[in-house]
Amino acid sequence: MDVPLASKTFPSPSPSKREQCNIDGHKSSSKHADLNPHVDDSVLGIILGGGAGTRLYPLTKKRAKPAVPLGANYRLIDIPVSNCLNSNISKIYVRTQFNSASLNRHLSRAYGSNIGGYKNEGFVEVLAAQQSPDNPDWFQGTADAVRQYLWLFEEHNVMEYLILAGDHLYRMDYEKFIQAHRETDADITVAALPMDEERATAFGLMKIDEEGRIIEFAEKPKGEQLKAMMVDTTILGLDDARAKEMPYIASMGIYVISKHVMLQLLREQFPGANDFGSEVIPGATSTGMRVQAYLYDGYWEDIGTIEAFYNANLGITKKPIPDFSFYDRSAPIYTQPRHLPPSKVLDADVTDSVIGEGCVIKNCKIHHSVVGLRSCISEGAIIEDTLLMGADYYETEADKKLLAEKGGIPIGIGKNSHIKRAIIDKNARIGDNVMIINVDNVQEAARETDGYFIKSGIVTVIKDALLPSGTVI
């Protein structure tokens, strides 16, 4: 089990890191690297909580997108926060706007008021959207979300701002990202994914020169426009064979921006721009600023839709190596310490699945599924290709007895129920002999009053929903 964050210390980087070397092994002469390159006291992390999450609805009905549960024990926000902490970045702000109560609660419980770092001054602090005489509107995009709190970010004595999204699944060493920014004397550095032609049409692409400097942008190009965006990805570090397979680079929506550049862009040059990706970054390129690409050639998933979220979760059960592993001790993923008992599995057949803490599983079959915290699965149930998010609390035996007397249904999965290719949100009450198998192969349906939606053929049962015994979906 990963060590709870509260019990783990985050040492300051070794003084030996203060003297950086470039690829050739010589001391860097970069104007940035001449300054203190200690990321722990020179970089401020800013995680953007995102919009209303309409494509992830109904999972975002009662929570912000970064607060959506992930991988049985975690939440999406744990990914960028953990990446920061593992990269020795311990001063972190999280910008929120929609349904932020559960996100705020999770962050305060998981990361506390002091998380170590440089001079023991680390923090993870939530900044909610607010209205003021100067800003009567809620924030309108990624750049506007930063601009509204620029007065606060400016107070920090840092060299760069690290702008991150709160709904991506990946593991990245931001120290290398930031060092590349400094060694290239960049004003802005954009994290980039190598792409093949099939995937490239769904992303915003970038074109670079022979020094890795971004010179052109194109949003979801096709045909001849797509071919015009081909680049030599060996410039960014791919070998010849892989560069041939991946001749495009797409923006990950992750940026390192020098402090003085950020202030200049958002206040002076583009005071009305709302979005980094479509307005501020291309604008900076057009005005002659040095905007560099930094290649990230690892697993990355934008958890923007129900289908992407479902696939990312089920991907952690993949054999022999999952798409994303929560078992990497060199870069662990931290979360809220809940002090739950071990899961109890009684006469159950469980294969190719991940089981969270505190579950009670009785005489049932579970295959290729992720079972979340405090899940209760009754006798005879069959769970296949499914994500169960679990529950926020246990019901006592007295509660269950009282429910039974009133004809109610306890939290969890009832006896002899069959669930396949579904997402069951927290605290759902699934009765006995319920079939959630999409019998009619429906691809899209909104049945909110009945407690479920279907998107991309995946049935999603709403948080706190009740499906009576005998229900068939």
UniProtKB/Swiss-Prot annotation:
Leading EC class: transferase
Main localisation: plastid
Region (Disordered): 1-36
Keywords: Allosteric enzyme, Amyloplast, ATP-binding, Chloroplast, Nucleotide-binding, Nucleotidyltransferase, Plastid, Starch biosynthesis, Transferase, Transit peptide
Catalytic activity, EC: 2.7.7.27
Catalytic reaction(s) noted: alpha-D-glucose 1-phosphate + ATP + H(+) = ADP-alpha-D-glucose + diphosphate
Compositional bias per record (Basic and acidic residues), positions renumbered to this chain: 16-36
The keyword Methyltransferase is annotated on this UniProt entry: no
Localization (cell): Plastid, Chloroplast; Plastid, Amyloplast
Example of a GO biological process term: glycogen biosynthetic process
GO MF annotation terms: ATP binding; glucose-1-phosphate adenylyltransferase activity
GO cellular component: amyloplast; chloroplast
Protein's UniProt keywords contain Chloroplast: yes
Origin superkingdom: Eukaryota
Tissue-wise expression: Abundantly expressed in the whole grains, a slightly less abundant expression is seen in leaves, while a low level expression is seen in the roots. A greater expression is seen in the endosperm than in the embryo and pericarp layers.
Activity modulation: Insensitive to 3'phosphoglycerate and orthophosphate.
Pathways per UniProt: Glycan biosynthesis; starch biosynthesis
Family per record: Belongs to the bacterial/plant glucose-1-phosphate adenylyltransferase family.
Subunit record text: Heterotetramer.
Reported function: This protein plays a role in synthesis of starch. It catalyzes the synthesis of the activated glycosyl donor, ADP-glucose from Glc-1-P and ATP.
Protein name as annotated: Glucose-1-phosphate adenylyltransferase small subunit, chloroplastic/amyloplastic
Organism for this UniProt entry: Triticum aestivum (Wheat)
Protein encoded by which gene: AGP-S
